Design a protein with these regions (language model features):
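Enzymes that bind and transform nitrogen-containing heteroaromatic metabolites
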Residues: 7-225
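A gly/proline- and charged-residue-enriched helix-loop-helix capping module
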Residues: 2-3
Length: 225
């Protein structure tokens, strides 16, 4: 189990993919209506501050952290490790439709950011990766592994990106926070698939930190790991 990333890399030539999100008690990732989720609006906290150290520990475990263009525009996230002493993973920004301006803070502040763009944009940053949505996520994962040697990824959003990974079955592990508070509406969170399993070898698959609960699930393809 401890070497799961290495064995998966050797077998598939793709990174180990961990999907991560936080949801309210009634199943929303963001409690704001669509008209309020506009570029520059900022993030919408779901969990309490007490959840942050574990979230940053999860980030530090992986080599890359994936975010979609819409989330980058609306939330303007930092996507680094701040609450613990550990290196931050490389940011992988998915923007195949060219929505992001080169002056965006994520690009300006992260010299080693991997910018995933459509083939018509060419190499727009020092670390560009060309990819089209129609190629599928497996093609992107193979490219990120071959070109940037990323052995593992933490996919943090947004909802569209997370659901794409789920629909294409391009994931290995899920880590989900659940808040005791309800938002009463907003942006629906993804649904953990029925074919997910508890972690093996008696490892904790759920827990509580402060008021928030967390769940860690494994894809059923790893049932014998």
């Amino acid at each position: 189990w401890q070497n799961r990333r290495f064995f998966w890399n050797a077998k598939t030539k793709r990174p180990w993919v961990v999907l991560k999100w936080a949801e309210s008690r009634d199943g929303y990732m963001d409690g704001r209506p669509l008209q309020e989720r506009q570029p520059g609006a900022g993030g919408f906290p779901i969990t309490a501050e007490t959840a942050r150290p574990l979230t940053h520990t999860w980030r530090a475990l992986e080599q890359g952290i994936v975010v979609g263009a819409n989330t980058a525009l609306v939330d303007t996230p930092e996507l680094n490790v701040r609450s613990i002493e550990a290196p931050s993973p490389r940011i992988v920004l998915l923007d195949p439709d060219g929505l992001i301006n080169m002056e965006h803070a994520l690009i300006q502040r992260n010299d080693n950011l991997i910018y995933v763009v459509g083939p018509t944009k060419g190499s727009v940053t020092k670390h560009s990766c060309q990819w089209e949505v129609k190629e599928g996520l497996d093609a992107l994962l193979e490219r990120l592994y071959a070109e940037f040697n990323l052995s593992s990824l933490l996919v943090e959003g947004g909802a569209t990106v997370l659901n794409d990974f789920l629909k294409q079955d391009a994931w290995n592990e899920i880590k989900c926070w659940r808040s005791p508070a309800a938002t009463g509406g907003g942006l629906p969170a993804p649904t953990i698939p029925d074919h997910s399993l508890p972690l093996p070898h008696g490892l904790a698959s759920s827990g509580q930190l402060g008021v928030d609960a967390w769940t860690n699930r494994l894809h059923s393809r790893h049932a014998s790991d």
